[in-house]
A protein has these predicted regions:
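Negatively charged
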Residues: 1-457
């Protein structure tokens, strides 16, 4: 019996199928397409593929996708020299513990999008035999606007080791979400990565909470435009060396180091951010959000002239004592909600270079924090350049800034402010300088315990 050349979806959605054994009389030597052959065979526990001849197969995309009860798939004798796509091949094989791909020839493969995504029981995988000179895709694109793209090893939550030392990424465009949520992965050898064509490394190590060091010295980032959430929730990382990064084409760094709660220092003085528009995002968090152990941060080279979003950029950086933002120019800034909230060790902050003329809201409703709320060590704050004519929301703006003795708000216009709850909550009596009687009336309405002084022009 000869299987048809196009054997795509041959057993797709056979949800009651538990056992498959191919006899020697089932001839697959002429088969070109095995796409989705066992797709969503959700009850399949035993699959004998030893007699299959796959030497002419070109397409193996989604071949075993969704076979959630298979614990092992033996394809160790397969000849895959003609295969061009392994797209989603083992995706969603959530019971798969071992996988032998030692015979695979991947020299003609162009697409490995999400090949192993969702293999949540897989502990180790050796792909050292994989040669990928033609590899273009390792990401599966989203099917609709609200779903994310899916990366090569995404949600391989038990994966501790992976050997991809012979991969060639020289033609690959995106490494987005490559190791997303590989939370047990303790080390990755990236020394052989050729990333000269890569434009997207967003969320590449997102949720890799066991990675202690990440060596990116070989990374060529000259074409990269998206670095958002690259190291998000890398909670064990104590050293991330990005000193050789070329960031001249990057447009978003939102959440890049967010939740890297073990980082103590970060030198980004080499970063060229002239094209960056987003250092934060309202959906998620800011670039350094919750870097709670960060004591030293060098952003002296940052060009922020094109930035429009700094949402929660430094929020929860509780160990940061100094922050030099004197180079920050912000003519296009529209979002800075809770930008410095909970920077409880920060002693001084000079924002005299900031242009806030396009800002309307300064607080974050989801976390009930304000722009400077809980900056309890702050003794000096320069907001003399603030243009607040369009601001309507100043909720908890200076709440619990308990070390401030005086505050010059003489540039502030409160005429459009409608939300101001807990504006000065928790502050001891101190002097606030305002420009006119209307401003003084506003402060007295907000907190009658504050000593408000009209500053003469």
């Amino acid at each position: 019996m000869y299987a048809p050349e196009n054997s795509a979806n041959l057993f797709k959605n056979f949800t009651s199928l538990t056992n498959v054994t191919f006899s020697k009389y089932f001839n697959t030597s002429n088969v070109i397409n095995m796409q989705g052959m066992f797709y969503d065979c959700t009850s399949l526990t035993n699959l004998d593929l030893t007699s299959l001849d796959v030497k002419n197969v070109v397409n193996m995309s989604s071949m075993f996708r969704g076979c959630s009860k298979l614990t092992t798939i033996d394809v160790g004798n397969w000849n895959t020299k003609n295969v061009t796509t392994f797209h989603d091949m083992f995706r969603g094989n959530s019971s798969l513990k071992t996988l032998n791909l030692s015979s695979f020839d991947t020299t003609n493969v162009t697409d490995m999008g999400a090949m192993f995504a969702g293999c949540s029981k897989l502990e180790t995988i050796d792909l050292s035999n994989f040669k990928t000179p033609n590899l273009i895709k390792i990401v599966t694109p989203k099917y609709n606007d609200w779903d994310p793209n899916v990366g090569l090893f995404e949600n391989c939550t038990s994966l501790e080791q992976v050997n991809i030392s012979n991969f060639d990424f020289s033609k690959t465009i995106s490494l987005e979400r490559m190791f997303y949520n590989c939370k047990l992965l303790s080390s990755i050898d990236l020394s052989t990565f050729n990333t000269e064509s890569v434009t997207n490394i967003a969320s590449m190590f997102y949720g890799c909470s066991k990675l202690a060091t990440i060596d990116l010295k070989k990374f060529n980032t000259s074409k990269v435009t998206d670095m958002s959430f690259m190291f998000y929730n890398c909670t064990s990382a104590s050293n991330i060396d990005t000193s050789l990064f070329d960031t001249s084409n990057v447009t978003t760094m939102a959440g890049m180091f967010a939740n890297c709660s073990n980082l103590k220092s970060l030198d980004l003085s080499n970063f060229n951010t002239k094209n960056v528009k987003a250092f934060g995002t309202i959906t998620w968090r800011g670039m350094f959000y919750n870097c709670s152990k960060l004591e030293e941060l060098n952003v002296s080279s940052f060009d922020t002239s094109n930035a429009n979003n700094m949402y929660m950029m430094f929020a929860n950086c509780r160990s940061l004592k100094k922050l030099d933002l004197s180079n920050f120019k912000t003519p296009n800034l529209t979002s800075m909600e809770s930008m410095f909230a909970n920077c409880s060790s920060l002693e001084s902050l000079d924002l005299s270079s900031f242009d806030t003329s396009k800002i309307t809201i300064t607080s974050d409703d989801s976390s009930t924090t304000g722009l400077f709320s809980d900056c309890s060590s702050l003794t000096s704050l320069n907001v003399s350049s603030f243009n607040t004519e369009k601001m309507t929301d100043m909720k908890r703006m200076f709440a619990n800034c308990s070390s401030l003795k005086s505050l010059d708000l003489s540039s502030f216009d409160f005429s459009n402010v409608t939300r101001y709850i807990e504006f000065f909550k928790g502050n001891v009596s101190f002097n606030v300088y305002v420009k006119d009687q209307a401003s003084k009336d506003f402060i007295n309405k907000v907190d009658s315990g504050i000593n408000c002084v009209i500053k003469e022009a």
